[in-house]
């Protein structure tokens, strides 16, 4: 365990840990949870997946927990307002998809679902076997609760009870699977320590916790969001090309943290990349992006991302062939649109309608600054109308915003 802690400290990704954790000796089992709030994991979850892989590399037996029950409640950690509750059918469907994804990324570890033990828990059992061991004073002192209780939004009893359910998860895994360590992001520390206290109060034994920092940008905002939404791991939602480009668009300052948290590159190589970053930031950024895309989508996904990038950028999109445009649409960077929905409309309206620009104001500003391109030619008149003269091969349109944001429109 000491070797793992030393490595995490060397990488700068150890946020908090329980006293005495370093003295644990093999065999040790640990778990990390994934709530099925969406049908796909996102790039933030990749940190947890890498963390479980890292535990395994240091001889710790990892377990991934899918929150089929807690996903019905919603973790208030890091949230200023209450989540919209998902119905049971949606959570069940999400859980199945998350379990399949985790089995793909973590083929050699156990995956459990807390719906198996929380789903049948009665209210009386909840109050007697769980609620009895928690004191309101300590619960109200938790940062996540404190921030919400005195806010205008407040906190519901449902969300307030979340940490009790997570604590019960830890106790269940401690008792039935020998799990003594819970891991998670820094926003989970309050929930983790509640579980440790619950296990102690129940007389089950000594448990431990370990957290890693949240992945944030220089402004403290969580990394993993774009103008078009969340960066998903499912290639149907975020293509390998889009994932690759997402990392290329990050600032140079964010790459060291990305390399430490989202890759399994060894500690010395990560430190060496820091030095290379000073002299050749683009090469380092591209290398890290390639490593992550290959890890997430395999060699085939990386090849697709690189081929799409080559089609778009090698010759600035000029002389692009019909087959290349078709491949771009297939790779996930294109959208299918009915001709009747856009032909005859102003470009100013079309780019907003397609979600390529967030508003007409943004579109107008880009046009005035010569920053919005149609088939690699700047759009210069905000009153211009989309007609047949803009179609490549009587079917495609290539939209570009600046140097990096591109999209193929298929009017088939």
Curated annotation (Swiss-Prot):
The gene is tyrS. A motif ('KMSKS' region) lies at residues 222-226. ATP binds at residue 225. GO terms for biological process: tyrosyl-tRNA aminoacylation. A motif ('HIGH' region) lies at residues 36-45. Its EC number is 6.1.1.1. Gene3D superfamilies: HUPs (3.40.50.620), RNA-binding S4 domain (3.10.290.10), Tyrosyl-Transfer RNA Synthetase (1.10.240.10). The keyword Protein biosynthesis applies. It is an enzyme of class 6 (ligase). L-tyrosine binds at residues 31, 162, 166. It holds the Pfam family tRNA-synt_1b. Residues 345-412 form the S4 RNA-binding domain. One of its GO terms (cellular component) is cytosol. It catalyses: tRNA(Tyr) + L-tyrosine + ATP = L-tyrosyl-tRNA(Tyr) + AMP + diphosphate + H(+). Keywords: Aminoacyl-tRNA synthetase, ATP-binding, Cytoplasm, Ligase, Nucleotide-binding, Protein biosynthesis, RNA-binding. This is Tyrosine--tRNA ligase. InterPro entries: aa-tRNA-synth_Ic, Rossmann-like_a/b/a_fold, S4_RNA-bd, S4_RNA-bd_sf, SYY-like_C, Tyr-tRNA-ligase, Tyr-tRNA-ligase_bac-type, Tyr-tRNA-ligase_bac_1. It comes from Chlamydia muridarum (strain MoPn / Nigg). Homodimer. Signal peptide: none annotated. Its main location: cytoplasm. Catalyzes the attachment of tyrosine to tRNA(Tyr) in a two-step reaction: tyrosine is first activated by ATP to form Tyr-AMP and then transferred to the acceptor end of tRNA(Tyr). It is found in: Cytoplasm. One of its GO terms (molecular function) is RNA binding. PANTHER family: TYROSINE--TRNA LIGASE, MITOCHONDRIAL, TYROSYL-TRNA SYNTHETASE. Belongs to the class-I aminoacyl-tRNA synthetase family. TyrS type 1 subfamily.
């Amino acid at each position: 365990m000491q070797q793992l802690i030393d490595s995490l400290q060397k990488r700068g990704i150890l946020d908090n840990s329980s006293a005495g954790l370093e003295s644990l000796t093999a065999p040790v089992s640990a778990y990390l949870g994934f709530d099925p709030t969406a049908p796909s994991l996102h790039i933030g979850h990749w940190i947890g997946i890498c963390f479980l892989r890292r535990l395994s590399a240091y001889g710790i037996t990892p377990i991934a927990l899918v929150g089929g029950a807690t996903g019905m409640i919603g973790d208030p950690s890091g949230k200023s307002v209450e989540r919209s509750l998902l119905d049971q059918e949606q959570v069940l469907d999400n859980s199945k998809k998350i379990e399949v994804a985790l089995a793909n990324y973590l083929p050699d570890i156990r995956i459990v679902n807390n719906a198996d033990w929380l789903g049948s828990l009665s209210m009386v059992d909840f109050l007697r076997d769980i609620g009895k061991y928690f004191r309101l004073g300590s619960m109200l002192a938790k940062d996540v609760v404190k921030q919400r209780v005195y806010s205008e939004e407040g906190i519901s009893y449902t969300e307030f009870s979340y940490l009790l359910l997570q604590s019960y998860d830890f106790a269940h895994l401690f008792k039935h699977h020998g799990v003594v360590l819970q891991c998670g992001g820094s926003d989970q520390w309050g929930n983790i320590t509640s579980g440790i206290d619950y296990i102690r109060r129940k007389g089950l034994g000594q448990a431990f916790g370990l957290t890693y920092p949240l992945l944030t940008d220089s402004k403290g905002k969580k990394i993993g969001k774009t103008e078009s939404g969340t960066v998903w791991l499912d290639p149907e939602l975020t293509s390998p090309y889009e994932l690759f480009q997402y990392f290329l668009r990050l600032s140079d300052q964010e790459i060291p943290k990305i390399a430490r948290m989202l890759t399994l590159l060894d500690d010395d190589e990560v430190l060496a990349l820091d030095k290379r970053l000073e002299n050749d930031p683009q090469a380092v950024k591209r290398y890290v992006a390639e490593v992550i895309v290959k890890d997430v989508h395999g060699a085939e996904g990386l090849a697709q991302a690189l081929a799409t990038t080559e089609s778009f950028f090698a010759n600035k999109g000029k002389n692009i062939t019909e087959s290349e445009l078709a491949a771009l649409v297939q790779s996930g960077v294109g959208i299918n649109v009915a001709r009747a929905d856009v032909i005859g409309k102003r470009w100013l309206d079309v780019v907003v309608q397609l979600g390529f620009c967030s508003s007409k104001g943004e579109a107008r500003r880009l046009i005035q600054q010569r920053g919005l391109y149609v088939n690699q030619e700047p759009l210069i008149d905000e009153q211009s109308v989309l007609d047949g003269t803009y179609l490549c091969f009587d079917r495609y349109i290539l939209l570009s915003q600046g140097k990096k944001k591109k999209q193929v429109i298929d009017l088939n």
